[in-house]
A protein has these predicted regions:
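Solenoidal tandem-repeat scaffolds enriched in leucines and small polar residues
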Residues: 164-249
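Bacterial Sec-dependent N-terminal signal peptides
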Residues: 1-41
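Short beta-strand elements that form the blades of beta-propeller/WD-repeat-like
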Residues: 31-45, 80-92, 131-142, 179-188, ...
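Repeated scaffold domains used in trafficking and secretory/extracellular systems
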Residues: 25-29, 70-84, 116-130, 164-178, ...
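Post-signal peptide N-terminal segment of secreted/secretory-pathway proteins
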Residues: 46-146
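Structural motif
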Residues: 44-55, 92-101, 142-152, 190-198, ...
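Intrinsically disordered, low-complexity segments enriched in Gly and acidic/Ser/Thr residues
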Residues: 243, 247-344
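A short beta-strand motif characteristic of beta-propeller blades
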Residues: 58-75, 106-118, 158-165, 203-211, ...
Length: 374
């Protein structure tokens, strides 16, 4: 079995660690003895639905469906944290914001933009806190330049209160940390540079704008709430209070690649679980883990812990679509799509590096998009 540990640091050094590749002998599945529950958001027939999956120690099964979570298109804008997730979507020119708290198993759904025509808006990015939803959008104004706005909408279902902050540049991404909102913007008319607008949520005032240069493409937060600005070849870590910056540069061919992931999970130790594009692998979208403290990436190629028969026939894996970590059992959960079907997938559970043992698999009538561990 062969795996790779890619180390990137400010000195641009890197190293590789490998072990033997899996043979075509069937991999033994190891059963767990600790009960775990997972909430899995899946795509099926262009809609999202959610199920509760239970692991009893003897088997892993779908226990029930979340009846309160439905009618959400699969192409909705998604924003997730460790504990909750929200979706923004527009249907028949009506906008909605649906939020799910995995810790309390509660769902809220609120209408948005009832004062505007949703079909005339281009919503670019969304985020949320425990109290508010944040929606960055642009709209055309007759005879004027485009208007760029962030709307702050209460998640209280009994009130429709909101406020708006006008931006002078196009919003690209948005993220909340503490009592501040961070908006990645692009000056598309003059410099093509990216900027970070810092908004005080107590006053809805932009208190600072940072010049990020070119190719600042995405925002994340780490386990301590610091803001991660992701570039193709590096990332910048920003303290949300002091706005102090730290720079991390990757060596050649050691880029983690989390800038393109559709799903991710940050654990308590500061490791980012994501899926990475590997064009030369048997499955090109694969699980990976980036350790911010060690500045290293472990890439999980399917052919290194599954046999060819398991990969192509038994599990029939086309690509990684979701990822999570079960800290009770020390398992990596890999959601995947099956070959030949748009609406069939499953979840593999494996032990992380250096063991790489297959625990079990669950086939699903849908393609996992996000997994929460209870």
């Amino acid at each position: 079995m062969k795996t790779y540990n890619i180390v990137a640091c400010l000195m641009l050094a890197f190293s590789f660690v490998a072990c033997e590749k899996s043979t075509d002998t069937s991999t033994e599945e190891i059963k767990t003895s600790v009960v775990s529950d997972y909430t899995v958001f899946m795509q099926n027939n262009n809609q999202l639905n959610a199920v509760v999956v239970n692991s009893t120690g003897e088997e892993i099964i779908v226990e029930n469906t979340l009846a309160s979570f439905n009618d959400v298109p699969s192409n909705s804008l998604k924003y997730r944290t460790t504990l909750d997730i929200s979706y923004f979507y527009t249907s028949n020119c009506q906008s909605n914001f649906q939020w799910y708290d995995a810790s309390s198993e509660t769902t809220k759904s609120i209408p948005l933009f009832e004062d505007l025509d949703s079909c005339e808006l281009n919503v670019i990015a969304t985020a949320h806190s425990s109290e508010s939803g944040f929606i960055a959008y642009e709209r055309e104004l007759l005879g004027k330049d485009k208007q760029f706005v962030v709307r702050v909408n209460s998640l209280d279902q009994t009130t429709a209160s909101y406020s708006e902050i006008t931006l002078d540049k196009k919003p690209i991404d948005i993220i909340a940390s503490g009592d501040r909102l961070f908006v990645l913007t692009l000056d598309e008319y003059v410099t093509d540079n990216y900027y970070l607008s810092v908004i005080d949520l107590d006053t809805d005032i932009i208190i600072m704008e940072l010049d990020l240069g070119v190719d600042a493409l995405r925002l994340f937060t780490n386990n301590s709430g610091k803001v991660i600005v992701s570039y193709p070849k590096l990332h910048t870590t920003i303290d949300p209070l002091t706005l102090d910056k730290e720079y991390t540069t990757y060596g050649e061919n050691t880029e983690p690649g989390f800038i393109t992931t559709n799903d991710y999970y940050m654990d308590a130790a500061g490791k980012l679980y994501f899926h990475k594009n590997m064009p030369s692998a048997a499955v090109t979208e694969v699980p990976a883990i980036y350790d911010f403290e060690k500045n290293s990436t472990v890439v999980y190629l399917f052919e290194n812990f599954l046999t060819e028969t398991e990969l192509d026939i038994k599990y029939n894996i086309a690509e990684t679509t979701a990822i999570a970590y079960d800290d009770k059992n020390n398992y990596v959960l890999i959601g995947y799509k099956k070959n030949g079907s748009a609406d069939e997938g499953g979840i593999l559970r494996i032990t992380p590096s250096p063991d790489f043992k297959l625990i079990d698999n669950l086939d699903l009538e849908g393609v996992p998009q996000t997994i929460f561990v209870k």
